[in-house]
């Protein structure tokens, strides 16, 4: 009978298991994953009947793009190892693959959910782009075809824009940190908009734009950012965080820059509208001026004098008609009525004549007043303008200008 010590048996088991299960693939459900401060990951993998403990060291874990969570279905690649002091075995994981979905896709969904929860995709936080962009920063590879495509569109559509090219890696393990630094640099240039872009490629090629460090740089930037990565069918984390998503780098330029031909046509249309509007305003103001001139003429002394003369003529005709009618109907009262009408006519005639004389004097005085130089006055005697030659010592006269009149007495008169 061969009797083993505990250590000997554990050693035999260790050698047997570790030599036989050098590379295994185990599928199961993750249970109680723990990220240790040392950087290692500890978890269990289970199915309906059994559980096996697993460990993944920091060096291998760094290559896993997603975060291991409780309940995930994984395919774990690794080897079996035995911890001899306790006689326990576990699976030392070297690779982790999600069941039914790729690792990168899972990492994408995890980061998308995380950033959405943090508010990175909120529409109310999106920064509006200026209506007319004067300066633009292109964060892309200086040697890539995407840059040449964007510069060509800029030249064709709106060559007046000033362009800053911020060179950066756009794929590879070192690309994401460099893209983040380039975005921060472009944000400090004071441009109107930043376009982060590259041409199409595989999911692995485009992956730097799915990294959290790039998402943070886009979200924290003060300048509006356009994400223009890959082709129209590619949707990346940078697209969701950016203020505007463009399907391609070329499309980004067409979306944010005006077309100079369309702008010239628009300016021509505006000029036509402005010219038509100015012509309309000129016509209206000309009509208003004509109305004002007519109103001013209607209020002039000459017009009022003509009005009174016309009124007197009309009244005279009406009175003659009235007299004729009365004479026909009351011939027996002719002598008496004739005397009354004669008196009335004489009185009315005198009144109207006085009004006419007064108006003529006012008109004359007004016309004369217009000839009076500034700070001078017109001399009036007995209601008529006179000169110094027409007055004598002791006469009382009025001194008048366009605003005031004053009574004066002539104390002396000497020839010059």
Curated annotation (Swiss-Prot):
UniProt keyword annotation of Hydrolase present: yes
CC per GO annotation: cytoplasm; exodeoxyribonuclease VII complex
Database matches in CDD domains: ExoVII_LU_OBF
Subcellular location: Cytoplasm
GO biological process: DNA catabolic process
Catalytic activity: Exonucleolytic cleavage in either 5'- to 3'- or 3'- to 5'-direction to yield nucleoside 5'-phosphates
Major location category of this protein: cytoplasm
InterPro entries: Exonuc_VII_L (IPR003753), Exonuc_VII_lsu_C (IPR020579), OB-fold_nuc-bd_dom (IPR025824)
Listed EC numbers: 3.1.11.6
Keywords, in A-Z order: Cytoplasm, Exonuclease, Hydrolase, Nuclease
Gene Ontology terms for molecular function: exodeoxyribonuclease VII activity; nucleic acid binding
Enzyme kind, highest EC tier: hydrolase
PANTHER family: EXODEOXYRIBONUCLEASE 7 LARGE SUBUNIT
Oligomeric and partner information: Heterooligomer composed of large and small subunits.
Function: Bidirectionally degrades single-stranded DNA into large acid-insoluble oligonucleotides, which are then degraded further into small acid-soluble oligonucleotides.
Recorded family membership: Belongs to the XseA family.
Entry protein name: Exodeoxyribonuclease 7 large subunit
């Amino acid at each position: 009978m061969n009797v083993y010590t505990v250590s000997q048996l554990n050693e035999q088991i260790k050698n047997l298991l570790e030599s036989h299960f050098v590379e295994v693939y185990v599928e199961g459900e993750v249970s109680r994953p723990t990220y240790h401060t040392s950087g290692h990951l500890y978890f269990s993998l289970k199915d309906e009947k059994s559980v096996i403990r697993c460990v993944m060291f920091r060096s291998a874990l760094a290559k896993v793009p997603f975060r291991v969570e409780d309940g995930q279905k994984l395919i774990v690649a690794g080897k079996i190892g035995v911890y001899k002091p306790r006689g326990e075995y576990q699976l030392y994981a070297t690779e982790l693959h999600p069941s039914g979905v790729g690792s990168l896709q899972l990492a994408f969904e995890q980061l998308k959910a995380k950033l959405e929860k943090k508010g990175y995709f909120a529409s109310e936080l999106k920064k509006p782009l200026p209506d007319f962009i004067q300066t633009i920063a292109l964060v892309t590879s200086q040697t890539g075809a995407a840059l040449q495509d964007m510069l060509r569109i800029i030249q064709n559509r709106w060559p007046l824009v000033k362009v800053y090219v911020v060179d950066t890696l756009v794929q590879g393990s070192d690309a994401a940190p460099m893209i983040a630094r380039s975005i921060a640099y472009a944000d400090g240039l004071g441009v109107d908009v930043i376009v982060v872009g590259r041409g199409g490629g595989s999911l692995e090629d485009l992956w730097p734009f799915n990294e959290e460090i790039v998402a943070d740089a886009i979200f924290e930037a003060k300048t509006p950012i356009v994400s223009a990565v890959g082709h129209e069918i590619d949707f990346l984390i940078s697209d969701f965080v950016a203020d505007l998503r463009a399907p391609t780098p070329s499309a980004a330029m067409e979306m944010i820059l005006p077309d100079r031909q369309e702008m010239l046509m628009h300016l021509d249309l505006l000029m036509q509208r402005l010219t038509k509007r100015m012509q309309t305003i000129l016509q209206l103001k000309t009509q208003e001026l004509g109305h004002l001139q007519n109103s001013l003429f209607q209020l002039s002394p000459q017009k009022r004098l003509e009005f009174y003369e016309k009124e007197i003529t009309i009244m005279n005709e009406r009175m003659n008609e009235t007299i004729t009618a009365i004479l026909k109907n009351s011939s027996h009262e002719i002598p008496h009525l004739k005397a009354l009408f004669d008196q009335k006519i004489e009185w009315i005639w005198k009144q109207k004549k006085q009004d006419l004389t007064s108006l003529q004097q006012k008109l004359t005085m007004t016309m004369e007043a217009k000839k009076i130089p500034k700070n001078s006055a017109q001399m009036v005697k007995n209601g008529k303008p006179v000169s110094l030659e027409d007055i004598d010592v002791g006469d009382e006269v009025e001194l008048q200008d366009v605003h005031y009149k004053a009574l004066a007495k002539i104390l002396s008169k000497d020839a010059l």
